[in-house]
């Protein structure tokens, strides 16, 4: 599975460039002021990375939150003005993530789903799908982070920001 990773990542990046999907999403979401990112299990860290990337290079407030804890706070924020990005590839926690998407949609929230290619259910349930190749569950988090980084990158570009030199960010952390 690990040997196939570079090819899968390359194909994902090629498809993203060919389709123009992320530039179109940036056009839709560049003026959004807040985002909620949800992930469960291994994908919680990926959701946090996606939120962090959006903050760092697009200067948009974003929170990465464990999907299982959504009812303990973030659910109160969900509406049509606060988009939610869910990391929901087909793996052992998929059904629980589908339930989260349904709860968000019941509150008229906009959902962008990082989902496995060919996932017909999320293609219909989410407002937008960021597809990743089907893969071994231990490879999925590596693939799932790519759409989130592309999304942040395109939003920053759409806003005219320098993605190579984000403001107030150091390339290293110094311990005193």
Task: Give a label for each model feature.
Residues 4, 40, 87-132, 151, ...:
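Glycine-rich phosphate-binding loops that contact phosphosugars or nucleotide phosphates
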Residues 4, 125-176:
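Short alpha-helices
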Residues 1-83, 156-176:
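Active-site phosphate/pyrophosphate-binding segments
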Residues 7, 45-48, 52, 82, ...:
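Feature representing long, continuous alpha-helical segments
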Residues 69-105, 135-149, 157:
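Glycine-rich, anion-gripping cofactor-binding loops and their flanking helix/strand elements
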């Amino acid at each position: 599975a690990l040997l196939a990773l570079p090819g899968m990542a390359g194909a994902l990046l090629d498809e993203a460039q060919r389709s123009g999907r992320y530039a179109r999403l940036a056009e839709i979401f560049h003026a959004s002021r807040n985002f909620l990112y949800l992930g469960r299990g291994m994908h919680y860290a990926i959701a946090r990375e996606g939120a962090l990337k959006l903050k760092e290079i697009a200067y948009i407030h974003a929170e990465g939150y464990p999907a299982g804890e959504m009812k303990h706070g973030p659910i109160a924020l969900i509406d049509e003005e606060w988009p939610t990005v869910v990391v929901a590839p087909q793996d052992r926690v998929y059904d629980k993530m589908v339930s989260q998407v349904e709860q968000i949609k019941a509150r008229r929230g906009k959902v962008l789903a990082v989902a496995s290619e060919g996932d017909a259910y999320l293609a219909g349930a989410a407002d937008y799908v960021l597809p990743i190749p089907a893969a071994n569950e231990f490879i999925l988090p590596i693939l799932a982070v790519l759409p989130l980084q592309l999304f942040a990158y395109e939003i920053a570009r759409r806003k005219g920001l320098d993605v190579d030199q984000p403001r107030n960010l150091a390339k290293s952390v110094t311990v005193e």
